[in-house]
UniProtKB/Swiss-Prot annotation:
Belongs to the sea anemone sodium channel inhibitory toxin family. Type I subfamily. Residues 1-19 form the signal peptide. Residues 20-26 form a propeptide. One of its GO terms (cellular component) is extracellular region. This is Delta-actitoxin-Aeq2b 2.
Length: 82
């Protein structure tokens, strides 16, 4: 069971880490709340994408052409927007 969890985690990590080479880059990752989304009375739009921090990205943890848009930085990931 532990080996299966490690393999699944590794597969997800590698898929997200190599996502900047993908054509459909905006369709990968998990939606997140950007500061520009703001509080709305009927719920918020999640316009950002959660990116895992890897060595190939800039200091903000976002791929090329994207910028950090969250309220605070995560330890393993950042909320980025194109």
């Amino acid at each position: 069971m532990n080996r299966l969890m490690i393999l699944v985690f590794a597969a997800v990590f590698l898929a997200l880490a190599s996502a900047d080479e993908d054509v459909d880059i905006a369709k990968r990752g998990v939606p997140c709340l950007c500061v520009s989304d703001g509080p709305r009375p009927r719920g918020n739009n999640l316009s950002g994408i959660m990116w895992m921090k890897t060595g190939g990205y800039g200091g903000n943890g976002c791929p090329k052409g994207w910028h950090f848009c969250g309220k605070s930085r995560g330890f393993f990931s950042d909320c980025c927007k194109r």
